[in-house]
Amino acid sequence: MKRPFRGLRRPPNPRYDAVVIGSGIGGLILANLLAREGLQVLLVEQHYMVGGYCSTFRRGGYTFDAATHFYPLLGNPDTLTGRLLSELGVTTGWVKMDPVDTFHFPDGSRFAVPAGFDAYMAKLKAEYPEEAGALDSFFAAVRETYLLGLLHYFRGRPLSSLERLAPYHDLTVKQALDRWFRDPKLKLLLAADCPHWGSPPGRTSFVFDSMLRLSYFLGNYYPKGGSQAFADELALRIEEKGGHILTSTLARRIVIEDGEARGAELEVLRGPLRRAWQGGVVRSGVVVSNGDLLLTLEKLVGPEHLPPGALEPVRRLRATFPCWLSHLGLRGVPAGVLERAQGYYWDSLDMERVGRDALRFKLFAPTLYEPDMAPAGEQILIVQKVLEMDYHGVDDWERHKREIEDFIFTNLERVIPGICGHIVVRNSASARTSWRFTLNHQGAMLGWEMSPDQLGDGRPASETAIRNLYCVGHWTQPGGGITPVIVSAQQVAGEILRGRVMASRSGDRRLAMDVTDRAPQAPEPCVGGFLELKRTRRE
């Protein structure tokens, strides 16, 4: 697969202003923001492709999304998220998804979510007229918590200044649904996409869910060319801004001296660069980890460099579920069959068992939005199954794979009879596969759970106990998902850029900018709401 960015083909410079470890969307956006302000940036990725979960792979002429295929807001230029991509020079094309999602229920009925909010509300009220008043009240609360949540989690407004958020702050999705509704099927319908959070509704924040729920209606998109096209273009823009990218290169440790991050020790794993440079220490003013937080603190930093007891609160945090994926290349299956079959398949109304037996799987056909992902006239189907599992309790991953695949293909035949005879290419990815290619703890989908107690101050901050060491992405604030990790990148970029200005004023040349007579523009965290929040000038 030819990539548009070049990547370093020579040894890296001995020193950079910033080293970013990991090229998920958080790392890619952050590197772009820093490079845009003139910082010399090195982005390091252990895989041979960039993107993390937002990447693709090819098998037999089919291009499969490794994981992510759901991109709220990014294709809408009227949202601040979409506008940010434009400011960074990203020209990726986006296909709007309508319906947004489809839910298949145990009684055989289905509900397709329209892309327009008014149409969605009208459809809900038509199917549940006895709950019409409750729906109005519920979505009034959703809208309010959405805006207040943006101020709190994305803009950093303290909870004490947002009195109207207090009644909702500790509320879970399940508690909210039980408060407003009686019909168990309507409750499931309103939480039927909860697998995208990687946790059951009883452990998912109502506020954070509200923020995503309403963002659907500002546009939910699939990238032209697939996820890799988006990630690769972000990498290309980094290089155009003067940044460097090292793929197939593992960060072995973060160099800590006198309590400060001073660089990273790197090892080239494969590729032609290894003949000229096997690895070594690259010095930097700041280091940012876009990787797994436990791996960062336990292995790259080391407990000896952390304050006593610093690791225990992190080890107690709950990670999101892993997601099993089966990627299928199909021949001779009409697009209309897949269009009808797409969506979440629920076998029980008990949504708390989402990672066990309540949710059969989700089906998604990317070729309905981007036909070029498959050979002409052929199709791709991705089967996703969220799994609540004991990762370390699996002693035979091959047997685990056989059992899950047997379940998936037996049930897939129930949905689309005869489909197994049309499979040309078949590939499956377990939690262990996700860990292998991304190094995410136990193959977690979205970092830590987005439960009320693991958001805000309950979630690790981007600044660490080590000076000049930051974290970005779904293992830190504000949370998991495409928009939150972009906000994370903006927040970290702002901290780094403001820190460099302060260092230049104090005469600390290790962090100071080369040009000290002007402050770079620290990016405002983006929001993508029904209402755009006014930008406030930072003093």
Enumerate the language-model features and the residues they cover.
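C-terminal segments that line or cap access tunnels to active or ligand-binding sites in enzymes
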Residues: 331-433
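Mid-domain catalytic core of redox enzymes
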Residues: 252-375, 513
